[in-house]
Structures are given as structure tokens and as C-alpha cells.
Amino acid sequence: MVAAVGMASIAGYQWWTAPPGIAATPPLLTIQPPVTGRPAPLVLAEIADRAAALPAPVTAGRTEKVTIRAWYLHGQVSGGTTISALQAERRELVRRPDGSGTIVGSKEPPEFQSEADRREWASDHGGQRTTTWAAGGRSFFNQHRPPSTVEQLRQYLWRPNPPDSNGSVKTLQAMREVLRERALPPGERAAFLRLMAERPELRHEGRAQDRAGRWGEVFSVDSAYAGLPARYSFLLDADTGAFLGYEHMLTTTPGALNVRVPAVTTYETFLDGTFVD
């Protein structure tokens, strides 16, 4: 017997409500397959060329603002069983040229599959928090701007942790870290896309609408880099090369999480990445 699956929503966003005993997870992207089946490197190169042709903003001495709306599946072991909860978050980073800045983060109450799980939950129950720091008071992925050439960007993103090579998943994860803290002008976006185009495992999945209602092209790679087989995806604006979203989806097994695969465990929507003064 197949259990029914419905939808729930909050603040204009939706997620799946799962059958009893199964935690809620964000809905999968509905992807329209590409018509021509052209290889991912070619599609990315064309998007990169369009991004590079856009006028560059004056960035010297300017403040960056990065706004992210995200959904995370959290797990907690209690009494020998795993409790999973879906939590929506919003994060607004303001980063000034001298390195000082502010993060305003808000977390909505976690969603549980039962009241019993809610009572057992010992982690964050939501709320808002503002963090400020002076120049030099916070570490970032890199204190310098991302380079606009592929060779320099490859070195910029490299990190000496296993595996000790800049593989496809490590590259995408490093890009994600930068996107969470930097506004990328067109030249830097183009370099990101051209570096992505070098990854041999990367696939062009097709076209999809993100959770903010924007259309973009989906590029993915499959890997068990984090321990479980998963799909790592970016959603890109085909006209500007802007990164619209990031998704991490378990593909074949949920491990200890009480979810049904395929299951999205992380979805981040990059709502704003601009220079504001």
C-alpha cells in the first residue's frame, strides 16, 4: 500500500509532508530535460560567454550583500533512533570592504513528522539572531576576491583536505562556500562557469524553476563524497550566469535519516548577491 503524500506551506514556500514515520523534506526540482542533449561543457561555455559580455560594476571599495533562503534537513539521535526535522532559514550577509560586517539570520520552527519527535528535539527551535564583527573579526573562505581566470580560480578554490585533489564535488562545494559570502560580478561568474565546464562528471540535467519562481539550467554531479550516494546540483540563470540555487539530494539510501529517497537534504536559494554602496 502506498501512503499518501501532501504539501504544506509557510511564508509562500512549500515542502512535502511525508507519510507517518517519514520526515518531511523539500520537494524535488521538476526538471524539463534538454531538447538537444548538448554536452554540459558546451552549454556552460555559452552561458559563461554571455556573463562575461555583461558590463562590470565598479566594485572597488563597495559593500556586498548576499541573501540566502534555505531549507535544511537536520538529524538528531535520541533513544537509539534518529529524529529528522526540516527547517527553513533566511540569512542576510553584509560584508564591507574593510572586512567588517553583519549577518542577520532567522530560522523558522522545525517541522517534525510527529509531536513525539518535537518533544524529543534538543536542537534549535527557531528564532532570529544578528551577528556583527569588526575588521578582521571573522574568517571567510578567502579574504581576497575570487580571480576572473580559470587557472587562478582553480588555485583559489583548492583546499588541502582529503581527497588531496580538486575533484568535481570539492570544486562545487568550494564554489558554494564562496557564493554564500560573495557577490560575484560578471567576470568572476564567467570564471566559475568555465571551471565548472572542465569537470568531466558534470551533467546538464535540463531546465527547472527554483523555489523563488526563477527559471534556470540545472547542472549536477553524483558522488558519495560526504559518505552517502548523493547528487550535487547548481541552478544557473542562462542569460546572466547568476547562480540561483544549490541542492544536495540523497539518491539511493538515506543512511540513518528517516526519509525516503530520493530526498533533498539541503536546498539554498541565492536571492541576492549585489554591491550596495
What name fits each language-model region?
Residues 4-277:
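Intrinsically disordered, low-complexity prosegments and terminal tails associated
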